[in-house]
Structure formats: structure tokens, C-alpha cells
Amino acid sequence: MRSAQVYRWQIPMDAGVVLRDRRLKTRDGLYVCLRDGEREGWGEISPLPGFSQETWEEAQTALLTWVNDWLQGSEGLPEMPSVAFGASCALAELTGVLPEAADYRAAPLCTGDPDDLVLRLADMPGEKIAKVKVGLYEAVRDGMVVNLLLEAIPDLHLRLDANRAWTPLKAQQFAKYVNPDYRARIAFLEEPCKTRDDSRAFARETGIAIAWDESLREADFTFEAEEGVRAVVIKPTLTGSLDKVREQVAAAHALGLTAVISSSIESSLGLTQLARIAAWLTPGTLPGLDTLHLMQAQQIRPWPGNALPCLKRDELERLL
């Protein structure tokens, strides 16, 4: 016997979270809980403002429609990426397809003072990998900060993300301030320039490896082995169903590319599922999931070792 519940939620964010020139004051989303007999599965649907093609309201409408169809015996999935991902996660938990084992390591995310990152990394066991957002300030400053971090921590590897912020000139200004001897320890720089061709040229000219992120969601993108391209960053909330995520990971691995499962600032429930997906599909690759510190609360399932308060299901608004 099938049954389902849908919850709506809103989590206050820390004051300094800015996405594409918009301050993100709250993170809004939905949960779906599917039951079939004794089994239960959860999924999170939380479109990311400025990045997702669908709004939270559109996702809610699509989710409620899909849940009603599922209750009637339908086996299909919704079209909207965030809804398809959340629904497929709930189904994968329900059927036991999604393994319980998780990779709760996370590449620390540096969003402010680089000194804070140095302190965090000093206590980090094993390989030291961190992520730094670039392109928010002057390119020269970004280059100096990256150089400082690589100089201060000789065994550090950095993942950088520019979100297509730079012109070719700005990208070159950044590279000029990174010691050529350190550039091999830049694991990759996500989408440095506004166009793929400019990003490819940047990789060739500087020797700094790049990764595709936004490009994966463009209609003309194809997976290819290219000079200077080292990785793809897969954000399941923006990608679609678990099957689509698996297809992208497999396509990347077939070409020798690193595939990194990455957060779209999901709640703790969604992040713990992404940690399980990473352990399942990209074992041995550190996922990019260090975004919980941007929020003021956890929900339903806490992240292991995190001290933020965790809300229970009866504290959320139920829609169904």
C-alpha cells in the first residue's frame, strides 16, 4: 500500500551568502517521503535561485502532481531537474538502491578569510584538498590569495570555482599572480571564463587544469577528452534524476576525467544523501559538500559531528 507526505521548509542562512549578485537570506525547499508497506524513502527538492531553471513554487506544483500520480501506481519521473532528483532519491531509498555507506569527508570551502582555511586544514587528516570561490573580488587579489594558500601549505591541493566570472584578460591577471611552480597543485579551476573556448585557451596558456560545471547543463555539451580539462563537477539538484547523475559520472570516468559530486546548498538531509551518492558513484574522490556551515539549522537527518540544531519532521509545514 503506497502512501506519501510532502513537507515545505525554509532555513535561515548566514548573512554573507551571495549567489550571482543576490543575497540568499533563506534556503527554501521541499521534502517528499514515500512509503510502500514497511519501507520508506526520502528526497529533497530545493531548486537553487539563480542556477535552477525552475522556481521553488513551480517545483512544488510539479512535485505534488507527481506524488499523486505515484500514489495511483505511476512509475515515471518528473521533468524538472530538482524534482526529478528528489523523487528519484526517495524511490532509491524506498527500493534499497541507494547504499547506506557515505563519504562524509568534505573539501573545506573558503568563502572569506584565507587564514581561517589555513587553521581548518591544519587539523585535516589525510590528503588536504580545499575549495576556494574566485571571481567575487579582483582577479589579482584572487591570484594572491591562492598563491598564499599554496605557499603556506605545501601538501595542499586547491579546487577553484570562478562561475564564468572572468574575461580572458581577468583570467590571465589571476594566473600571473600564481607561482608557476604551484599551479600543478590547483586540482582544477571550474569554468574560469564566460565561454568554453576562452576557458580552454586559458588552460592551454597557463597550464592550470580546468573543470566543467555549468557547461554540463547546456544542450550542446558533449563529454570529450580535451587538453587541459581534468574534471567535471556534477550538482545533482541541477542535473536531474539519479539515473542521469549516474550516466554523467560514467561518461566522465570512461574518458579518464574526475567526477566530483557537489552541493547546491541542500539541507542536511540532502547533503547526507549526496554523501551516500558520492561514496557509491565516485569512491575515492572527495565530494564538494561543505555548505552546511552557511545555514543556521539542520533538518530530519543531521550531518555526523555537526553541532547545528536539527529540526524534526513534526516541526515542518506539511502539504500532503
Curated annotation (Swiss-Prot):
Its EC number is 4.2.1.113. Mg(2+) binds at residues 161, 190, 213. Pathway: Quinol/quinone metabolism; 1,4-dihydroxy-2-naphthoate biosynthesis; 1,4-dihydroxy-2-naphthoate from chorismate: step 4/7; Quinol/quinone metabolism; menaquinone biosynthesis. Keywords: Lyase, Magnesium, Menaquinone biosynthesis, Metal-binding. Belongs to the mandelate racemase/muconate lactonizing enzyme family. MenC type 1 subfamily. The gene is menC. This is o-succinylbenzoate synthase. The keyword Magnesium applies. CDD domains: OSBS. It catalyses: (1R,6R)-6-hydroxy-2-succinyl-cyclohexa-2,4-diene-1-carboxylate = 2-succinylbenzoate + H2O. InterPro entries: Enolase-like_C_sf (IPR036849), Enolase-like_N (IPR029017), Enolase_C-like (IPR029065), Mandelate_racemase_C (IPR013342), OSB_synthase_MenC1 (IPR010196), OSBS_N (IPR041338). The active site is at residues 133, 235. Converts 2-succinyl-6-hydroxy-2,4-cyclohexadiene-1-carboxylate (SHCHC) to 2-succinylbenzoate (OSB). Transmembrane segments: none annotated. Its cofactor is a divalent metal cation. It holds the Pfam family MenC_N. One of its GO terms (biological process) is menaquinone biosynthetic process. The lineage of its organism: Bacteria, Pseudomonadati, Pseudomonadota, Gammaproteobacteria, Enterobacterales. One of its GO terms (molecular function) is magnesium ion binding. It is an enzyme of class 4 (lyase).
